[in-house]
């Protein structure tokens, strides 16, 4: 295939087109063509480059040569004065400014929020929607340096109308909120008193160890005292093991005890008549609950 090719004619058009710069390619036939071989190995080290050293024409770019290098800082963090050379993209920036105004986020205030640099540039205002920095804006920047300006009204409401947060906010709402726990209304006190009385009654039913005289003495000051007076918790006096064993033995034989037997147990166990009576009442309620639980367990019907 290569034997029929005349390398002199193959190389001559390139010499005619490119002139004297490629004159040294005259030896390409001896270097590239071997009559005894089908394949050849080109030697490009002796061949000059096809492109001239200096570019023949300047390549035009759609943007200026003074385009700054790519930076990691986003557009919202940079002042608008540094982007004056991109005139072809002004419509995009105008659309962005319009969107920011639509969202109540002027470009200058956004930059002040993010960069906290008030004097880095002049004013950059949208021509259709000029704005002025509000008086309490710089105080709100201290309160909210991350969220947009639209969220500042929540902080202003928290501080009652903007400004630096005082040491003691003079808000009437906060004062009332603070005063409510200190002086709750009478209805709340009444409900608390009722709840305390119910809890005390339940405690008396479950733990009837306190004496009747002590219980009555504890209830009388509670009734006669002022509503906002602190309630004193009555002292718990659990039964001893010996007393519980004797009471359980008597309950095993007699669920309901008469007055004579009750007085006898009170003298023997060093208890009052009321304590023995309350213990038997609570023991009967406990036995009733246990029997109901046993019935539910063995019958398998939780509605019983």
From Swiss-Prot:
| CC terms in the record's Gene Ontology section | chromatin; cytosol; nucleoplasm; nucleus
Biological process, per Gene Ontology: anterior/posterior pattern specification; embryonic digit morphogenesis; embryonic skeletal joint morphogenesis; endoderm development; metanephros development; organ induction; positive regulation of transcription by RNA polymerase II; proximal/distal pattern formation
| Matching InterPro entries | DUF3528, HD, HD_metazoa, Homeobox_CS, Homeodomain-like_sf
In the UniProt record, does the keyword Ubl conjugation occur? yes
Q: Where is this cross-link: Glycyl lysine isopeptide (Lys-Gly) (interchain with G-Cter in SUMO2)?
A: 82, 116, 178
Q: Where in the cell is it found?
A: Nucleus
Which stretches are labeled DNA-binding? 232-291
Keywords assigned: Developmental protein, DNA-binding, Homeobox, Isopeptide bond, Nucleus, Transcription, Transcription regulation, Ubl conjugation
Classification via Pfam families: DUF3528, Homeodomain
Q: Where is this region: Disordered?
A: 166-237
Gene Ontology molecular functions: DNA-binding transcription activator activity, RNA polymerase II-specific; DNA-binding transcription factor activity, RNA polymerase II-specific; RNA polymerase II cis-regulatory region sequence-specific DNA binding; sequence-specific double-stranded DNA binding
Among PROSITE patterns, the record links this protein to: HOMEOBOX_1, HOMEOBOX_2
Return the PANTHER family for the record. Answer: HOMEOBOX PROTEIN HOX-A11-RELATED (PTHR46092), HOMEOBOX PROTEIN HOX-C11 (PTHR46092:SF1)
* Family affiliation: Belongs to the Abd-B homeobox family.
Function, as annotated, reads:
Sequence-specific transcription factor which is part of a developmental regulatory system that provides cells with specific positional identities on the anterior-posterior axis. Binds to a promoter element of the lactase-phlorizin hydrolase gene.
Protein name, UniProt field: Homeobox protein Hox-C11
Report the source organism.
Answer: Homo sapiens
Species classification: Eukaryota, Metazoa, Chordata, Craniata, Vertebrata
């Amino acid at each position: 295939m290569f034997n029929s090719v005349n390398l002199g004619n193959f190389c001559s058009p390139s010499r005619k087109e490119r002139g004297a710069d490629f004159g040294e390619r005259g030896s390409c036939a001896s270097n590239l063509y071997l009559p005894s071989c089908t394949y050849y190995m080109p030697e490009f080290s002796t061949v000059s480059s096809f492109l001239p050293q200096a570019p023949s024409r300047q390549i035009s770019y759609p943007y200026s040569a003074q385009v700054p290098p790519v930076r990691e800082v986003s557009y919202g963090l940079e002042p608008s004065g540094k982007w004056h050379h991109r005139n072809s993209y002004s419509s995009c920036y105008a659309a962005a400014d319009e969107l920011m105004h639509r969202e109540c986020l002027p470009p200058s205030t956004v930059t002040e929020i993010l960069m906290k640099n008030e004097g880095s540039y002049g004013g950059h205002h949208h021509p259709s929607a000029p704005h002025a920095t509000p008086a309490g804006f710089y105080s709100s920047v201290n309160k909210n340096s991350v969220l947009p300006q639209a969220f500042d009204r929540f902080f202003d409401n928290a501080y009652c109308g903007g400004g630096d947060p005082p040491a003691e906010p003079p808000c009437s709402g906060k004062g009332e909120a603070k005063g409510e726990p200190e002086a709750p209304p009478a209805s709340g006190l009444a409900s608390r008193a009722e709840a305390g009385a119910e809890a005390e009654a339940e405690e008396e039913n479950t733990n009837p160890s306190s004496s009747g005289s002590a219980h009555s003495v504890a209830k009388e000051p509670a009734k006669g005292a002022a509503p906002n007076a602190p309630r004193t918790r009555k002292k718990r006096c659990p039964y001893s093991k010996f007393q519980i064993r004797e009471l359980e033995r008597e309950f095993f034989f007699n669920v309901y005890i008469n007055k004579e037997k009750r007085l006898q147990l009170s003298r023997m166990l060093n208890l009052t008549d009321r304590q023995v009576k309350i213990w038997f009442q609570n023991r009967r309620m406990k036995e009733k609950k246990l029997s109901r639980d046993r019935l539910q367990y063995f019958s398998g019907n939780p509605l019983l």
